[in-house]
Regions:
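N-terminal cap/recognition module
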Residues: 71-112
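Adenosine-phosphate binding glycine-rich loop
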Residues: 2-24, 220, 322, 335-453
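Rossmann-like adenosine-cofactor binding region
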Residues: 264-367, 372
Length: 453
């Protein structure tokens, strides 16, 4: 039995009740086989795979808080500090009813390699709670965040573990948590990222994931002698990632004609009006039918069910899934290929199913997964950490310029890794495997240099 298979068997026995974590580990280790086989004796002797698949520590704690009716509520909080071989733990805090230990471990494991890809000195971790912020008052949100941070603050710090926002955790929640950390610890430090601009946040953080996605997409296309200007893009989602991906695509000369939310999707053949989309989603916080009502050229389509991914039925050269997990399935992939799609680059985390990914790659589509393509968000979080450490605030242009350089370097690194190990599929480099290998090699080199720890 190969070393990879031995470790997968061990991981499956230890984590049988955590399907998301098992899926992530299996996918990553399978893609790393050529790299691991080339160094098997060294990795086996140092138990590299056993160590890299086991978190440094897993924290689970009670979060009691009082709702507006005076009733005490209890949620469960998590922080998985997965690996700090190349820097302090770094990863978001997810607030959603679906959160459990397995999901946090899966996200933390993936974060290790994503953070490594950024070229910046940050390790991987993830946290959150099964608390649902939807429908809660500001006072209830504050009560939860303060209780959550009262426990979490014992385990984090600017040089130890620096959490950030994620699903359910925006600027409001980060502010409440930062205030509670400062109150309890008596220390003003860059312990969280995604902060407001008045207390240590970074310019361009809001735009970072969407902009970064387009910087990498453009680097990918240039490497294949394809000009992004004039290309039609299909985009899913209507949140920060989608909005700023559309904005940057338009700045680069492409035209985005779709976007979507949980109830429906827009087709606008004249190109999505970013200013109107921002007004609808960020100011009015309305559904996309409000966009269509204000835009004569736009068509609004109500989603028939959760599996209605109509944006992918529109003919496009570039597909940018920026909404949620498993939103682009095999049927969607077949439609995209039939319509002549050139590239699919992921703005969301795992938006493309395994079957769809395989189909796209085997049919010659340039495919870059979210681990590399949406790393702009965490890269800019690390730039926020740098600014906090220096007690400086960089201009938007400085941050954006550094982000562009980081995303272009990420593309170069994953392309190089795929070529070094002859990882190809459908006549193109396997950028998914390349991302895993490039991220893995940096972490492992640091682990080997630091001994058994």
């Amino acid at each position: 039995m190969s070393y990879v298979d031995e470790v997968l068997e061990i991981v499956q026995k230890k984590n049988a009740d955590q399907p998301e974590f098992l899926q992530a580990v299996t996918e990553v280790l399978d893609s790393l086989r050529p790299c691991i086989e080339a160094n098997e004796e060294l990795y086996r002797k140092n138990a590299i795979l056993e160590r890299i698949t086991e978190p440094d520590r897993q924290l689970m704690f009670r979060v009691p808080w009082v709702d507006d009716n005076g009733q005490v509520q209890v949620n469960r909080g998590f922080r998985v500090q997965f690996n700090n071989a190349i820097g302090p733990y770094k990863g978001g805090l997810r607030l959603h009813p679906s959160v459990n230990l397995g999901i946090i471990k899966f996200l933390g494991f993936e974060q290790v390699f994503k953070n490594s890809l950024t070229t910046l000195p940050i390790g991987g971790g993830k946290g959150g709670s099964d608390f649902d912020p939807k429908g809660k008052s500001d006072r209830e949100i504050m009560a939860f965040c303060q209780s959550f941070m009262t426990e979490l603050c014992k385990y984090i710090g600017a040089d130890v573990d620096v959490p950030a926002g994620d699903i359910g955790t925006g600027a409001r929640e980060i502010g409440f948590m930062f205030g509670q950390f400062k109150r309890i610890r008596g220390s003003y430090e860059g312990v969280l990222t995604g902060k407001g601009l008045t207390y240590g946040g970074s310019l361009a953080r809001t735009e970072a994931t969407g902009y970064g996605l387009l910087y990498l997409t453009n680097a990918l296309l240039k490497d294949h002698d394809i000009d992004i200007a004039g290309k039609t893009c299909a985009v899913s989602g209507a949140g920060n990632v989608a909005i700023y991906a559309i904005q940057k695509a338009h700045q680069l000369g492409a035209k985005c004609v779709t976007c979507s939310d949980s109830t429906g999707w827009i087709y606008d053949p004249e190109g999505i009006d970013v200013a109107l989309l921002k007004e609808v989603k960020e100011v009015k916080r309305a559904r996309l039918d409000a966009y269509a009502a204000a835009r004569p050229s736009a068509e609004y389509h109500v989603k028939k069910d959760a599996n209605d991914h109509g944006v992918w039925s529109i003919k496009c050269a570039l597909a940018l899934p920026c909404a949620t997990q498993n939103e682009l399935n095999l049927d969607d992939a077949k439609m995209l290929v039939a319509n002549g799609v050139i590239s699919v680059t992921e703005g969301a985390n795992m938006p493309t199913t395994l079957e769809a990914t395989k189909y796209l790659q085997e049919n010659g589509v340039l495919f870059v997964g979210g681990k590399a393509a949406n790393a702009g968000g965490v890269a800019t979080s690390a730039l926020e950490m740098s600014q906090n450490s220096e007690r400086l605030s960089w201009t938007f242009e400085e941050v954006d310029g550094k982000l562009k350089g980081i995303m272009e370097t990420i593309y170069a690194n994953i392309s190089d890794a795929a070529k070094r190990y002859n990882m190809t599929v459908g006549g193109n480099a396997d950028y998914v495997a390349g991302a895993n290998i490039a991220g893995f090699e940096k972490v492992v080199d640091a682990m080997l240099a630091q001994g058994v720890c």
